[in-house]
């Protein structure tokens, strides 16, 4: 399990992940192709939430999270 906080990023390999937030936040990804971070479709959480999502190999980052955290498993 990986926990990230506001404006922190972590690299993930391609696969299916469970993402669990403790509250409102926005999840972004960067493929390393020079386009920079982009918001994941349905990656804007307005409350605590758990989702299952398939991701490519990328860097994940959360923004607009305040004190909220994201757990990746």
What are the roles of these predicted feature ranges?
Residues 1-73:
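Acidic, Ser/Thr/Pro
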């Amino acid at each position: 399990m990986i926990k990230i906080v506001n404006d922190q990023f972590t690299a993930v390999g391609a696969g299916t992940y469970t993402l669990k937030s403790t509250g409102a936040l926005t999840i972004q990804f960067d493929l390393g192709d020079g386009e920079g971070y982009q918001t994941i479709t349905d990656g804007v959480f307005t409350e605590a939430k758990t989702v299952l999502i398939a991701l490519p190999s990328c860097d994940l980052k959360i923004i607009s999270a305040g004190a909220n955290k994201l757990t990746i498993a």
